[in-house]
Design a protein with these regions (language model features):
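Solvent-exposed beta-strand/loop surfaces of large extracellular or lumenal domains
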Residues: 172-178
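Extracytoplasmic low-complexity repetitive segments enriched in small/polar residues
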Residues: 2-27, 31-33, 244, 248-249
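Extracytoplasmic/surface-exposed domains of secreted proteins
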Residues: 21-27, 36-155, 159-165, 181-235, ...
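Extended alpha-helical scaffolding regions
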Residues: 270-320
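Extended, polar beta-sheet/loop recognition surfaces of beta-rich domains
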Residues: 210-280
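Active-site-proximal structural scaffolding
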Residues: 194, 245-247, 303
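Generic structural motif
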Residues: 208, 257-259, 288, 315
């Protein structure tokens, strides 16, 4: 009977399919933008007629005013959890393995990094407001600028996950898994912040481009906005301070528990110099009984050390 093949988890810093997959394999700069959309040249042939070269435009972040909630397959922690470990990162998972980069209007940079068009932000409920505004397509989060992560690092907090190793093929290709086993693929965003113990948080899925922010808030988008594709917010020296309003595609809330997980307990440990007798219990065999000879009180070998389960590197038991 053949042994079962163990599952193998493969992680990709980004993933694209279809026309965008071909775009990512091309060298050079990103294709031009028209009204904030990627312009891709394709060749069409209809019913055997002569081929026609045309340019197509893909949807961009400025076209998105909502997502299908069924795309979200899991959140960590679950909504309304009250004792989430503060040393863990919140996360959100999507059914499509390419979802975080689906509407990114660019290709990967020279370092093979691709920024997602969405990110997961986690902000403290105290000092933040999540509200529904009439005649606006999405809920609005208002919070302090200091609560938000650095979007220059958003590429590092997104990845795709592929599970392989349980198919008839010993080394299935990525294309095979995407086509034949979509249930083994997903994408994930992590919330880039360190959580505090016993604190309530909002976890919100928001756009990373300013055109996406304006589209979600129902604000007008100018031609300069579409061509510039500025980030939805900025961090670092010279960045604006104060509050920022962001449209929210998906959100939930949770609370962290008290500090008391393994990490916090391990951090409380303090190294101390221990004596060489740690882990030993003296055992007197000078009067064993049962007719065996009795040893004088000071005779060598009359006192032995019985070792325990724990000992230090310096523990030095008496020889038997």
């Amino acid at each position: 009977m053949p042994e079962p093949t163990a599952a193998s988890y493969r992680f990709f810093s980004w993933l694209r399919q279809g026309l965008l997959a071909g775009l990512s394999n091309q060298a050079g700069a990103s294709p031009p933008l028209t009204n904030g959309h990627l312009v891709l040249p394709i060749r069409l042939r209809v019913n055997g007629a002569a081929p026609v070269d045309v340019n197509i435009q893909r949807y961009g972040p400025g076209d998105i005013t909502g997502i299908d909630a069924r795309e979200v397959i899991r959140t960590e922690p679950q909504a309304h959890m009250t004792d989430f470990e503060p040393n863990y990162f919140p996360a959100i998972e999507f059914d499509r393995p390419d979802f975080p980069w689906l509407f990114t209007p660019a290709k990967a940079d020279a370092a093979r990094r691709l920024h997602p068009w969405i990110c997961l932000i986690v902000v403290r409920k105290e000092g933040a407001a999540l509200s529904t505004v009439p005649r606006q397509p999405l809920p609005v989060l208002t919070c302090g600028q200091e609560e938000l992560p650095d979007l220059d690092q958003s590429w590092a907090w997104a990845h795709a996950q592929i599970v392989s190793g349980q198919t008839a093929s010993p080394n299935p290709t990525l294309q095979q898994i995407l086509k034949d086993h979509p249930d083994r693929t997903l994408s994930r965003l992590l919330g880039a912040r360190r959580l505090d113990p016993n604190t309530a948080y909002y976890a919100c899925l928001v756009p990373t481009y300013d055109v996406g922010r304006k589209a979600g808030l129902g604000e007008p988008i100018t031609a300069d906005d579409e061509q510039g594709l500025k980030p939805a917010w900025s961090q670092g020296p010279g960045a604006p301070t104060g509050t920022v309003s962001l449209p929210v595609y998906f959100h939930w809330e949770f609370r962290t528990g008290l500090a008391g997980d393994f990490e916090s307990l391990a951090r409380r440990l303090e190294p101390k110099q221990l004596p060489t007798t740690v882990g030993l219990r003296p055992m007197d065999i000078g009067q064993p009984g049962w007719g065996m000879p009795v040893l004088p009180p000071d005779a060598p070998g009359g006192l032995l050390d019985l070792g325990g389960a724990l000992r230090t590197p310096e523990t030095n038991p008496r020889p038997w």
